[in-house]
């Protein structure tokens, strides 16, 4: 089993990637928006009684940082592609921009689609035009993501589940890779 996992968050600016990380790592919600250029942090998590060091890499969604963003992709074990349910363009950009960038840099790394700011569906000014769960699930299927999750860093709903799923997805991918290696090492050849 993996003793450390690298999890990279991508998506447009201001979709809530940093808020999601802050809520998960410090159980607080940042009051002011602060654009991210490149940031990483780590926490220890437990899965099935085993401690895993989870490295969390927050990337800039702004196109001005497109050239340095791939540096954070190196050796990623799982990618969280995030969009805000209140920002339809951020949703469309997962398919039109982000999945292409991820697949060209990390062709075999599992991806999860994460809908953020779900509290906006109940109380936001754009609640009537918010992206619904069915649209999000369909997008996840279209981009061949390993899963679809929803969360709100503001209300702390679904945050823990996002990272539990990320860890489980990375561990399962590593197990599959190891099984394939075992089979290729133990191949029997008859001449």
Swiss-Prot record:
Expressed only in hematopoietic cells. Present at very high levels in the thymus, less abundant in the spleen, and least abundant in the bone marrow. Expressed at a higher level in the TH1 subtype of T-helper cells than in the TH2 subpopulation. Expressed in neutrophils under inflammatory conditions, such as cystic fibrosis, ulcerative colitis and appendicitis. The keyword Nucleotide-binding applies. It is found in: Cytoplasm; Cell membrane. InterPro entries: P-loop_NTPase (IPR027417), Small_GTP-bd (IPR005225), Small_GTPase (IPR001806), Small_GTPase_Rho (IPR003578). Its main location: cytoplasm. A lipid is attached at residue 188 (S-geranylgeranyl cysteine). A motif (Effector region) lies at residues 33-41. Keywords: Cell membrane, Chromosomal rearrangement, Cytoplasm, Disease variant, GTP-binding, Lipoprotein, Membrane, Methylation, Nucleotide-binding, Phosphoprotein, Prenylation. The modification Cysteine methyl ester is found at residue 188. It comes from the Eukaryota. Residues 189-191 form a propeptide. Induction: By CSF2/GM-CSF. Down-regulated by phorbol myristate acetate (PMA). One of its GO terms (molecular function) is GTPase inhibitor activity. Phosphorylated on tyrosine by LCK. Phosphorylated by FYN. Phosphorylation enhances the interactions with ZAP70 and SYK and is critical for its function in thymocyte development. One of its GO terms (cellular component) is plasma membrane. Negative regulator of hematopoietic progenitor cell proliferation, survival and migration. Critical regulator of thymocyte development and T-cell antigen receptor (TCR) signaling by mediating recruitment and activation of ZAP70. Required for phosphorylation of CD3Z, membrane translocation of ZAP70 and subsequent activation of the ZAP70-mediated pathways. Essential for efficient beta-selection and positive selection by promoting the ZAP70-dependent phosphorylation of the LAT signalosome during pre-TCR and TCR signaling. Interacts with ZAP70 (via SH2 domains) and the interaction is enhanced by its phosphorylation by LCK. Interacts with SYK and the interaction is enhanced by its phosphorylation by FYN. Interacts with GDI1 and GDI2. Interacts with PAK5. Belongs to the small GTPase superfamily. Rho family. The region involved in interaction with ZAP70 is a non-canonical immunoreceptor tyrosine-based activation motif (ITAM). This is Rho-related GTP-binding protein RhoH. It comes from Homo sapiens (Human).
């Amino acid at each position: 089993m993996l003793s450390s996992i690298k999890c990279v968050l991508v998506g447009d600016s201001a979709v809530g990637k940093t808020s999601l990380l802050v809520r998960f790592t410090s159980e607080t919600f940042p009051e002011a928006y602060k654009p991210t250029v490149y940031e990483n942090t780590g926490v220890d998590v437990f899965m099935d009684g085993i401690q895993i060091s989870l490295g969390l890499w927050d990337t800039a969604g702004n196109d001005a940082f497109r050239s340095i963003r791939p540096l954070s992709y190196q050796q990623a074990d799982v990618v969280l592609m995030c969009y805000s349910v209140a920002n339809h363009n951020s949703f469309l950009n997962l398919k039109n921009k982000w999945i292409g960038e991820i697949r060209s840099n990390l062709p075999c790394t599992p991806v999860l689609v994460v809908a953020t700011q779900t509290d906006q569906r109940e109380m936001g000014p754009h609640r009537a035009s918010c992206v619904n769960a069915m649209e999000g699930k369909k997008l996840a299927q279209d981009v061949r993501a390993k899963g679809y999750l929803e969360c709100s860093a503001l209300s702390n709903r679904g945050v823990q589940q996002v990272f539990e799923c990320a860890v489980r997805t990375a561990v399962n991918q590593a197990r599959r890779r190891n099984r394939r290696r075992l089979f290729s090492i133990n191949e029997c050849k008859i001449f």
